[in-house]
Amino acid sequence: MLRNFLKSRFLAPRGMSCFSQVMNPITGQNSWQERGDDYDYHLEVANAGFGDMLHDWERNQKYFAALRKTIAGMREAGREVHVLDIGTGTGILSMMALAAGADSVTACEAFLPMANCAEKILAANGAGDKVRLIRKRSTEIQVGEDMPRKANLLVAELLDTELIGEGAIGIYNHAHAELLTEDALCIPARARCYAQVAQSPLAAQWNSLKTIANLDGEPLLHPPEQLKSCQGEAALHDVQLSQLPSSAFRPLTDPVEIFQFDFQRKQEREKQRAQLLKLQSKQPGAAELVFYWWDIQLDDGGEILLSCAPYWAHPQLKELAAEKAKDHPLPNVVPWRDHWMQAIYYIPKPLQLLEAGKSFHLSCHHDEYSLWFDAREEAPTKSVRRHTCTCDLHMTYSRSRIGQLNQSPRNKRYLRYLEESIEAEKSNVLVLGNGCLLGLASSALGAASVLLHEPHRFSRRLLESIVKHNQLKNVHFLDKVEELEDSQLAALTHIFAEPYFLNAILPWDNFYFGTLLTKIKDKLPEGVKILPCSARIYALPVEFLDLHKIRAPVGSCEGFDLRLFDEMVERSAEQAVSLVEAQPLWEYPCRALSEPQEVLSVDFSNFGQEHSLKGSIELKHTGICNGVALWVDWKLVEDNSPRSIVSSGPSEPVVPGEFVKWDMFVRQGVHFPRKPKDAVTHLEWSTDFKPLLGELNFSFGQKKL
């Protein structure tokens, strides 16, 4: 969510300041900024993500129910109950265990800011002297030294979207070997993992590079063989799968169980397993990807179930739809959480299934921390190894960037301009940005020369392979714009960018395009065409269904007072969290409360001009403004045609009161008001932009008139 600020540090004595080296994405320069010596602490606290879990009402209720049921059962059997809570966080599960009747509770938390907060929360809830809090990892705990006895009930939340990505296998194995009795019970007791094979041309765009064609459909740039043969990265692509439009994928199988993890058994959980499933396709299609999720049985009897399934496969869909359908679209009736999502795994070589009922084999594998998949017509004769990128594309660019490179409507807007503007054997084009295939396409359109600014090593190597494969003879690469000779600058007819830079997190970080222009503008000829010519930032007040919870205070949870946690996070957020953070808003539904309003306009021919603006947006739909969405519209040329605008925001016109449809291949900026107010009529805003310093600051306030 935040930029990767800390590249190196000068440490200072405690209570003093320190200096951190910060990369400014707009200027492209590193600078030393003074920070409090506890800045790292605040950054870590603000981004720990505990609040999201505490807003997960289903998780909280079902953990509490499982504790009550399990402890009551142990009592009925005449057993004492000694609980170990691994990774206690706020101490919420420890307090639940006490409330459910545990005889003793030992909690461990290795993240010291959280452990210190948990100590205060336990005391505030009357449990300070009843929970033994150990500030260590569970794998460092020794019975007799840290805890008086082995526990016979383990409660923990050690899971992530992949289930095992946070080391659950090793932690459970160690706990059973060193910290738990032979007859210990665990909450959760077991987990089941599911896979569903699907075809999705939309999702496939996040994984492979398509041919770039002109407006008539004739190929301009073909991907080289190394891209076609690359199996991609096996790493999961975690998404809110329920938000993938149903029209965007074709399920080829029903969901199938692929692995079980028994957290309760004394024997070691295997660190590596393989499962080969023979499946039949429900309909014709290409087996391109696997949708993945899991569920957990929190109690030993498997009666208390928590499922992370997308809505179409959720076991409680009918009941949840009956409860929420009036206020929520069907994909949003299932419990929301951002700490456990679903994942897409891309099959290394898509398998064509030409008819319904076609048999094929799905290979499922996991090691201690991750999973991978393959689909083949015949059963593989040997173990399928975890695949890795061999073409530079997947290891250089994010999933969203790969999808953006394939985004046909977006590409056509750029290509329309290039086709109309490039003169064969006359145009000399300077391309600025990372991985700018569209700029490279100007060579295929007949430009006399293309100077391509590409300082990133792997991105450059990828583009060089594309140049070689497509036999482009007039392309020259640059590490720095300062390398350009005066004669080269004087001969330029076009300067082109999308713009896209690898260091960019927020949409306007790509204003680095303007910074590069200022370095050469005094030597440019009159009449040189700059694309895009300008950019506009828009703000839209919205009401999120759920995303605001990642920054919202918790207050109380299942009857326990967690205000001390809220205070800790708020203090840290004020010092370490950007006022605007990046989020892929297509995954997080929100209703528009007004029309978008322009809050900044930047002319790239005069990029150095400073701006200080303020305004007010009238809310035209009733709702709680718990977020402000921001994005950039890039203006390609100065005309009134909507085809001259490439937006990083809504993909369809915004209508107040309706859900916004967002571009799925870029992240937008989001501001979360600290304390959203009821009955607000206006959103007041101000923008302050100092381009030469790379400073772009927003402020927002809610007002009732």
Curated annotation (Swiss-Prot):
Family of this protein: Belongs to the class I-like SAM-binding methyltransferase superfamily. Protein arginine N-methyltransferase family. PRMT7 subfamily.
Taxonomic classification: Eukaryota, Metazoa, Ecdysozoa, Arthropoda, Hexapoda
EC number: 2.1.1.-
Biological role: Essential arginine methyltransferase that can both catalyze the formation of omega-N monomethylarginine (MMA) and symmetrical dimethylarginine (sDMA). Specifically mediates the symmetrical dimethylation of arginine residues in the small nuclear ribonucleoproteins SmD1 and SmD3.
Keyword S-adenosyl-L-methionine carried by entry: yes
Annotated protein name in UniProt: Protein arginine N-methyltransferase 7
Molecular function terms from GO: histone methyltransferase activity; protein-arginine omega-N symmetric methyltransferase activity
PANTHER family: PROTEIN ARGININE N-METHYLTRANSFERASE (PTHR11006), PROTEIN ARGININE N-METHYLTRANSFERASE 7 (PTHR11006:SF4)
PROSITE patterns: SAM_MT_PRMT
One Pfam family recorded for the sequence: PRMT_C
Record keywords, A-Z: Methyltransferase, Repeat, S-adenosyl-L-methionine, Transferase
GO biological process: peptidyl-arginine methylation
Name of the gene: Art7
Native species: Drosophila simulans (Fruit fly)
Domain SAM-dependent MTase PRMT-type span(s) in chain numbering: 29-372, 381-705
